[in-house]
Regions:
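Short, charged/polar surface micro-motifs in flexible loops or helix N-caps
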Residues: 51-54, 62-66, 85-87, 94-96
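A short, N-terminal "cap"/entry segment at the start of jelly-roll beta-barrel domains
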Residues: 1-53, 99-106, 161-175
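Extended, positively charged loop/linker patches that create polyanion-binding surfaces
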Residues: 74, 92-115
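Glycine- and acidic-residue-biased ligand/ion/polar-headgroup-sensing regions
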Residues: 74-94
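Conserved short histidine dyad/triad with adjacent acidic residue
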Residues: 58-75, 118
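Double-stranded beta-helix
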Residues: 96-100, 106-108, 123-175
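Short beta-strand His + acidic residue motifs that chelate non-heme Fe in jelly-roll/DSBH
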Residues: 68-70, 88-90, 114-116, 122-127, ...
């Protein structure tokens, strides 16, 4: 597996091949890699680079991974669950929950695919020890097209993240 990609940083890998294929062994390797980085996540980008018009990624997040609520301007995003359980929480601009999509892999009987076509704040509450998913969005990557929710803590504010996620989990459990 090591010869199939190059590592951009501790969280991002790029495929070296024009045809990207992944198997169970690859996913297990990604799980190991995610467990050794601070934010407990890793992604394999199947697109060639950030300028590609289509971005496809295999992503692994551990349960403790925090995805700050965000939205994408001028982009759509789709997610297909490969392994694990997650609640996708969608918010209005003021941070009120609009919808929760409870997801799992196909065999779970839960929703296993969704697509967002409009800019809406969203985050993940990971319900399993590990979440593996395939995400597709249009490129090229432009950090300015990602808007982080001003009412949600930044990743580095660990205590506020713990409080925010605990409060969010309570709110979701009441829906």
């Amino acid at each position: 597996m090591l010869n199939k990609y190059h590592q951009q940083n501790v969280e991002v890998l790029y495929s070296k091949d024009s045809i990207t294929a992944a198997n169970q062994s690859d996913i297990e390797h990604f799980k190991q890699l995610s467990s050794h980085n601070l934010r407990k996540r890793i992604r394999l980008c199947a697109h060639l680079d950030q300028t590609d018009p289509l971005h496809e990624m295999l992503i692994v997040h551990e349960k403790s991974a925090y995805v700050r609520p965000h939205k994408h301007l001028g982009k759509s995003e789709s997610t297909h669950i490969i392994e694990g359980l997650v609640d996708v929480v969608l918010f209005d601009n003021d941070g009120r929950i609009e919808q929760v999509i409870s997801m799992g892999d196909y065999a779970s009987g839960k929703t296993f695919y969704y697509r967002i076509t409009t800019p809406i704040f969203h985050t993940l509450i990971i319900r399993s020890e590990v979440l593996v998913f395939h995400e597709t969005t249009n490129g090229p990557f432009d950090i300015r097209a990602t808007v982080f929710a001003p009412w949600a803590p930044e990743d580095a504010d660990v205590n506020s993240v713990v409080d925010f996620m605990s409060d969010l989990d309570t709110q979701v459990s009441l829906i």
